[in-house]
Structure formats: C-alpha cells, structure tokens
Amino acid sequence: MTEFSSKERYTMIRVLVIDDSATMRILLKKLIDKNEHMECVGVAPNPVAAQELLRETRPDVITLDIEMPKMNGLDFLDRIMRLMPVAVIMISTLTEAGSESALRALELGAIDFIAKPKLDFAEGVQAYAEEIYRKIETAGRAKVKKLTRDVPPVRMDAEPPAKPLLAEAGKDGRVVAVGASTGGTEAVKELLLSLPADCPPLLIAQHMPEPFMRSLAKRLDLLCAMRVKMAEDGETLRRGCVYIAPGHSNLTIDATAAGYVCRIVRNAGEAQSDSSVDELFRSVAAAAGARGVGIVLTGSGSDGAAGARAMMAAGAFNIAQDAETSVVYSMPDAAIAACGINEVLPLEKIAGKLMELDGA
C-alpha cells in the first residue's frame, strides 16, 4: 500500500513569493513550507524574474511586494489580473504611502494584504505566521475576477468636494451598521457609491490595521456623495455621514435623549478585535432596536453572525451579500446560518434596499 505524507493527503495551496528582499523571501518560504496545507513553489526577486515561474508553476496564490526594482508590484498586478488572474496577497508597509498602495492593489483585484512588521524583521515575520497562514488559506478559496476594464487611480492629494452638514440623526431614523473583511474595501466602496448624500448614518467595521483605515476613509470621502470620516468618541450621528471604525479600536454606539453617539473602545493591540463587527451590531441592537439595519458583506470568518442575530432579535432588518458577488462568503454565510439575516442580495442591490427601508 502506498504511503502518503501528511502534506500529500490534503489539497495543497501552491504559493509563489515575489519580493526584492532576500530575507523576506527566505522567511516567507520557510513559513509556507512549514504549513502542511501549503507549498512554496518558487521565489523571485522581482516581477520580471517571476514571469517564467508564474507560467511554469501555476500557483494558487502569489504574495507580492509593492515596491520592487524593474517593475513595481502594482504594475505587475494590473498585468496578471488582465492576462492570468490569480489570488494575490500584497506585502505592504504600515505607512501612509504603503496604505494607499495597498488600497490601490485591492482596486486592481488583489484579495488581501499583509503589513510588513515594523521592528526586528525576522521576529516580526515569525509573529505574523498565523496571519500569513490565515490569509493564504482564505486567498486559496477566494473568488478571483479577471480585470476587464481600466481602474483610474484616485488622486489622494485632491480636496474632497464640499458636502453639506446634515441634521443629526434622531431616534426615529434608521441607523445602519456594516461589517466586512476580505474583499470588503471594494464592496464597501461600491455600496457607498450607490447611496445618496442624505442617506441614514452608516457605521463601518472593516478588518484592517489603523493606517489603512485612515487611507480608506480619505479615499472614500473623495469618491462618495456622503461625508466619510474616522469615527470619534462622543460624536453625534448625522444623516449623510459614514463613520469608519479606527483600526486599533472597536466602534459602538449609545442612545441619547436626542439621538445616537459613537463610542470608541481602544484594544490592547494595534488591531480591532476579531469580534469588531459583533460588537458594533450588538450596540446597534441595544441602542436602535427596530430602527437598525445590519449589512454583512464579503469576508472570512464568522464575525458579525452573533451580532446580526442580536439585531434581528431587537427587531432590526439585516441584509447579507450573496455568494455570487462575495470574494469570500464565510461572513455572510455564518450570519445566515445563525438565523440573523432577513434578506440575501447581490451587492449592487443592497443600496436600493437600504433606501427603501429608510423610507419605511
């Protein structure tokens, strides 16, 4: 009888590493090959050197550095997503420039990104091992779409258009809570682009580190009719305003005599907790009850499922993005399984349903 290794008993995720740092290439290869469900099928110092490897190895996932000689990661990403779409995870620095580049990569079709460690390089990558494994596993089962049109870059140095400051949201109005993870930045953007300037207040919990959240808020504010900003503790919710949870904190709301206020709960680490969507949803259930609307967008894991159930128990109306338009369906699917969803819709129909509920 033939004996198989533990790796051979599973469908392996084949990973190609492209990074100009020899240290990063060695460490990523070592980490990937330690995981029994993954195999590093090749490493390359730049996209030019990677082109032949890409054809030969046909990887399931690519980890791609952004800043590299000969051809930068964004140009290479644009090319491969048009010609040979594959799940790509970007490797980005935790800086404003790195954050903007990572968000641009997501626009071009990258599945996710991993932030480079700030401190001791080897120790930092070792500490990120579980995140690397989780994101590669998610990318390995993600829905990859071919890039079929030009995606103009957002001019981040532009001034946002003037937007009127609308009235505070009273307790008789709708309050919308949105949760997302993998694939969520583009889903959130599409949702917001479909909403009018006077929509009910939206609160967004998106699994991303702090610098990326600031860049996301700025980018969305330039693109959308509503005001988009980082949520601040104690500020009153207004119509026409989108409040994004800081990457290092959970966002919740409290009810006051006049309306609702944001509450920011700082976490011990640099990232939101794994239950940031649940925390937001539970607070909306308690504060807004039947005037709440919950939206669970594409994402990995089950964050939001328990919170969606709490919102539904309080009388709220909850929407899940459908499998067809989700990059990763885990979060919507978990919320549906928890009996926390009223309606499942393709992404392009969620804004219309939200405005229908706002008028009800």
Curated annotation (Swiss-Prot):
Primary subcellular site in the record, as a coarse category: cytoplasm
SMART domains: REC
Domain Response regulatory: from-to ranges: 14-131
PTM annotation (4-aspartylphosphate): residues: D65
Domain CheB-type methylesterase residues, every copy: 169-360
Keyword Cytoplasm: yes
Keywords: Chemotaxis, Cytoplasm, Hydrolase, Phosphoprotein
EC number of the protein: 3.1.1.61, 3.5.1.44
Locations listed in the record: Cytoplasm
Cited SUPFAM superfamilies: CheY-like, Methylesterase CheB, C-terminal domain
Modifications the protein undergoes after translation, according to the UniProt entry: Phosphorylated by CheA. Phosphorylation of the N-terminal regulatory domain activates the methylesterase activity.
Pfam families for the chain: CheB_methylest, Response_reg
Catalytic activity from the UniProt record: [protein]-L-glutamate 5-O-methyl ester + H2O = L-glutamyl-[protein] + methanol + H(+); L-glutaminyl-[protein] + H2O = L-glutamyl-[protein] + NH4(+)
GO CC annotation terms, alphabetical: cytoplasm
Active site: S181, H207, D303
GO terms assigned for molecular function: phosphorelay response regulator activity; protein-glutamate methylesterase activity; protein-glutamine glutaminase activity
Alphabetical GO biological process terms: chemotaxis
Taxonomic superkingdom: Bacteria
Annotated domain remarks: Contains a C-terminal catalytic domain, and an N-terminal region which modulates catalytic activity.
Family named by the database record: Belongs to the CheB family.
Function, in words: Involved in chemotaxis. Part of a chemotaxis signal transduction system that modulates chemotaxis in response to various stimuli. Catalyzes the demethylation of specific methylglutamate residues introduced into the chemoreceptors (methyl-accepting chemotaxis proteins or MCP) by CheR. Also mediates the irreversible deamidation of specific glutamine residues to glutamic acid.
Identification of the protein by name: Protein-glutamate methylesterase/protein-glutamine glutaminase 3
Lineage: Bacteria, Pseudomonadati, Pseudomonadota, Betaproteobacteria, Burkholderiales
